[in-house]
């Protein structure tokens, strides 16, 4: 399901060798921009999206007709002020919103690639997106920013291109995917692949869609984005439009109905194979391993200013995993700031209207811009 909209698309002509050993070329990267690039071309912020995000950071998403996924943070006068900054965000390769992914046709046989699409990594995503800098003639970004998988891309970007951003903002992220998170992703993948409509990844050619499996994958993942306290306060044991239990398997509880809804609407906007590929890329991410066990070496060549943000109730990428990045940066004398935001909204806090987070982000950017 490659959703067609009025896409801004860059066709990357240069061959890109992937970590799996395969090479791709003449491939599309779908992107969106907000604000204006100044004459010095030094006010650009490259935003990286999370697992189920896309290039539509702000404004209205033309597919869902809802606000962009980071509308609380990006826009005129907001934390990432588009009156001041030129914001770029692209759909990652492997995605389903216009960038090169498993729904694209194979250039050799004309068939939808499905699981013949090459396995990609966070490193591959970042190297593909780097082409946007050349496209806009940007020598150095003002900032790179992103949460969750977006934060992984932020870390990979500054490791790969140490002199290409003045500031670096990884949010609610990690330097390597834990066993717990690999387990949750595998649960989602198995739900998709167990759906009889998956057809070994060839469902598009068979006019089918593994929507039930994808919905379950989304439901399971969505739980990890929340917190126990937040769930209890919002739902508790409240019943869904009924006065008593029905002694069946319909959604008796509000939380059941909520998760089913999250699964059903997700199927309308996301592709099952893309979910497989992107979660696999997240699981393969291990910046420490790339540098033979020394995370500090990933950042030793950069003079960028880091600002790392975590949330108290995030159990998907807990504060300690963010602090490990801070420790690695401190060990090489890097310019690094860190803040832990108190909130009960869980991992998804970076996507929500959390005033302390938004004010902290805005203050860091504004101060850095004044110094700049």
Describe these PLM feature segments.
Residues 170-265:
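Alpha/beta-hydrolase-fold enzymes
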Residues 324, 330-372:
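Catalytic active-site module of serine/aspartate enzymes centered on a nucleophile-bearing elbow/loop
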Residues 151-162, 168:
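Short glycine-enriched nucleophile-adjacent loop
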Residues 1-47:
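Catalytic-loop region of hydrolases
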Residues 66-67, 78-135, 182, 186-204:
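Cap/lid segment of the alpha/beta-hydrolase catalytic domain
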Residues 302, 308-310:
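Short beta-strand/loop motif that positions the catalytic acidic residue
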């Amino acid at each position: 399901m490659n959703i067609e909209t009025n896409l801004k698309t860059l066709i990357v002509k240069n061959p890109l060798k992937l970590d799996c050993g395969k090479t791709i070329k003449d491939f599309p990267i779908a992107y969106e921009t907000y604000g204006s690039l100044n004459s010095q071309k030094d006010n650009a912020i490259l935003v990286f999206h999370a697992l189920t995000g896309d290039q539509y950071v702000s404004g209205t998403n033309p597919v869902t007709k809802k606000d962009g996924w980071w509308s609380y943070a990006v826009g005129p006068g907001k934390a990432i002020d588009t009156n001041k900054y030129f914001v770029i965000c692209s759909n990652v390769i492997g995605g389903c919103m216009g960038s090169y992914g498993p729904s694209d046709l194979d250039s050799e046989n004309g068939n939808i690639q499905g699981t013949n699409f090459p396995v990609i990594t966070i490193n591959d995503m970042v190297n593909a997106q780097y082409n946007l800098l050349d496209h806009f003639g940007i020598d150095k970004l003002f900032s790179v920013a992103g949460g969750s998988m977006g934060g992984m891309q932020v870390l990979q970007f500054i490791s790969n291109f140490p002199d290409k951003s003045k500031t670096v903002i990884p949010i609610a992220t990690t330097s390597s995917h834990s066993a717990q998170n690999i387990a949750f992703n595998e649960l989602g993948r198995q739900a998709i692949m167990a759906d009889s409509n998956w057809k070994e990844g060839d469902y598009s050619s068979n006019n089918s869609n593994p929507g039930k499996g994808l919905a379950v994958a989304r439901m399971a993942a969505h739980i990890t984005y929340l917190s126990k306290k937040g769930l209890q306060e919002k739902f508790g044991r409240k019943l869904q439009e009924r006065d008593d239990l029905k002694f069946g398997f319909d959604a008796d509880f509000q939380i059941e109905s909520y998760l089913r809804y999250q699964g059903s609407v997700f199927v309308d906007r996301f592709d099952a194979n893309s979910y497989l590929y992107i979660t696999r890329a997240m699981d393969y991410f291990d910046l420490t391993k790339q540098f033979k066990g020394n995370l500090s070496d990933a950042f030793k060549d950069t003079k960028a200013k880091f600002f790392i943000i975590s949330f108290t109730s995030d159990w998907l990428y807990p504060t300690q995993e963010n602090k490990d990045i801070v420790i690695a940066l401190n060990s090489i004398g890097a310019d690094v700031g860190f803040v832990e935001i108190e909130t009960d909204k869980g991992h998804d806090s970076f996507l929500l209207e959390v005033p302390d987070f938004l004010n902290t982000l805005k203050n860091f950017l504004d101060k850095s811009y004044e110094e700049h």
